[in-house]
Amino acid sequence: MSSTWLAPAKINLFLHINNKREDGYHNLQTIFQMLDYYDELKFSITNGGVIKRINGNEDVEQSQDLIVKAAKVLQEYTGTTLGANLSIVKNIPIGGGLGGGSSDAATTLVALNQLWDTKLTQPQLMKLGLNLGADVPVFIFAKSAWAEGIGEILSPIKMPNYYYLVVFINKHTSTKEIFSHYALTMSKPQGKIAKFSELINTHNDCLQAAIALEAEIGVALKHLNTCANHISQVRMSGTGSCVFNEFLTEKDALAAAKKVPKKWMSFVTRAINTSPIHSWAVAKR
């Protein structure tokens, strides 16, 4: 028997880089907004301890695939003798700043913790996930969140369920290159916000570095600025390369999507405040 689970995308409503730490990482502040847009993962439990990806992500070596890595991390930590066959349907753009790989890893940890009956708590899973990537914990946390530290210090925040037009320019940006780029800016830490109405500064400190590395990001932002009825500043998510704007209605977002140049990928989605990750498989066995 197999079970199917969803892995949601996220956007960063702002991203402020505060300083560089001694360990090479950067302290930051951001809001992770969960989206109703998903990769789809399927898990079949096996005996014998073998973990194998049997479908999807063909361009990624199994040993480098985050879903395989996540499964092995959980297996090694818990000592389970069970294995799993893993399949994935990728919808979230790779290298777009939407957290797809991190979300896939998080879903793998949560799903196999249930399916293997390894009984780890959410905090334990989040700690394991942090070893796989700084964004993995928020997807295990499973709520839109105010984040600090390297993104692992999380507080839930309830945001409006706006519609978003997300554009991927079909080019990837390197997080490592952006964080070492001369155009990376820094922002002073701000007080934690408790509600959306307090969100004033939507600046992304990675934006100018990303545009310096990939000028088409700037072109896409200019295009989104021409869209009718968007309600806030157009923005880049994370370290790019996806950009987005915000709408009150799905109708307005879909109308804007029709005008996106065909050379780019785009989709319309809606904000969600809670991810279905901890309950999804119950209805999808």
From Swiss-Prot:
Chemical reaction(s) catalysed: 4-CDP-2-C-methyl-D-erythritol + ATP = 4-CDP-2-C-methyl-D-erythritol 2-phosphate + ADP + H(+)
Role played: Catalyzes the phosphorylation of the position 2 hydroxy group of 4-diphosphocytidyl-2C-methyl-D-erythritol.
Matches recorded under InterPro entries: GHMP_kinase_C_sf, GHMP_kinase_N_dom, IspE, Ribosomal_Su5_D2-typ_SF, Ribsml_uS5_D2-typ_fold_subgr
Protein's pathway: Isoprenoid biosynthesis; isopentenyl diphosphate biosynthesis via DXP pathway; isopentenyl diphosphate from 1-deoxy-D-xylulose 5-phosphate: step 3/6
Single biological process term from Gene Ontology: terpenoid biosynthetic process
GO molecular function, one term: 4-(cytidine 5'-diphospho)-2-C-methyl-D-erythritol kinase activity
Keyword annotations: ATP-binding, Isoprene biosynthesis, Kinase, Nucleotide-binding, Transferase
Entry-linked SUPFAM superfamilies: GHMP Kinase, C-terminal domain (SSF55060), Ribosomal protein S5 domain 2-like (SSF54211)
Matching Pfam families: GHMP_kinases_N
Residue positions of the active site: K10, D135
Gene expressing this chain: ispE
Family, as annotated: Belongs to the GHMP kinase family. IspE subfamily.
Record's protein name: 4-diphosphocytidyl-2-C-methyl-D-erythritol kinase
Residues annotated as binding ATP: P93, I94, G95, G96, G97, L98, G99, G100, G101, S102, S103
Enzyme Commission no: 2.7.1.148
